[in-house]
């Protein structure tokens, strides 16, 4: 558990954070430029000192301003991956990886190298590497220090699109195969959707929302960032099985079934899906004949007027589904909170896929 309760004045920015974060998975720190994202992880990493408050990691006090306790960065057991890789230019990749490597990680060296796909790079110097390769080496070096927490400050920000696409699959593998919790700073929605388990939304130095990705995505906290885009829903599902006759896969969504094009995934695998609100239409009764395969009963939670459209928040089990309709459709259907309707889902896209769902 990472316990944060501190304040810090940085020029015009007043950083004020009071929240607890789980010591597992990837927690995305999200917000616009100047929101305080990097300032937050700099306090955790020991690069800056807050004027008030405490930072506690797994019961160890990293910061207690009132007692003048500021554990130096090298004693915090916190790894840091910067926007630029900051490799030692006079060391080969192997030397960079071994610099600061914890004795307990010597037996893990080959596994980390394999996980990040950098074995062919071990004898090369940093100046011969691409941006994506440098970042993979930087991540490996940080992991080999045996950190209790890994901080990543927009590791894709300095990369062009091809290099981002090159590095993202390795970050996804990292999320699945390494037990080290990660705080991942980003202002990219796409990165967060692919990588994050939890999300912290920051604005003007303060935490505006914190929770699981699906929960925060469905809340109003992200709406200021989503208004320019088509709203969507993020849902957690698992594979039930595959159709005997058609190239279709059945997914469990709560106690309901969702059909999608056939996936190369075993029964029990969990994954995250994204459904655009414009791909969800509503009906008071299920149609008798329709080309749409997914027609699910849902309960209306609220209706929001947004720029001449209506966004309808729908409860589906313990998760939330958004539909975007016209005011005319809302009035004709007589939609109101608590009402049961049928959601017709036309299209589904996929984000990160995980392993079997535990019992």
UniProtKB/Swiss-Prot annotation:
Keywords: ATP-binding, Cell inner membrane, Cell membrane, Membrane, Molybdenum, Nucleotide-binding, Translocase, Transport. Residues 289-354 form the Mop domain. GO terms for cellular component: plasma membrane. Residues 1-229 form the ABC transporter domain. It is found in: Cell inner membrane. GO terms for molecular function: ABC-type molybdate transporter activity; ATP binding; ATP hydrolysis activity. It holds the Pfam family ABC_tran. It catalyses: molybdate(out) + ATP + H2O = molybdate(in) + ADP + phosphate + H(+). ATP binds at residues 31-38. It comes from the Bacteria. It is a peripheral membrane protein. Its EC number is 7.3.2.5. Its main location: membrane. The keyword Hydrolase does not apply. Signal peptide: none annotated. Belongs to the ABC transporter superfamily. Molybdate importer (TC 3.A.1.8) family. Part of the ABC transporter complex ModABC involved in molybdenum import. Responsible for energy coupling to the transport system. The complex is composed of two ATP-binding proteins (ModC), two transmembrane proteins (ModB) and a solute-binding protein (ModA). This is Molybdenum import ATP-binding protein ModC. It comes from Yersinia pseudotuberculosis serotype I (strain IP32953).
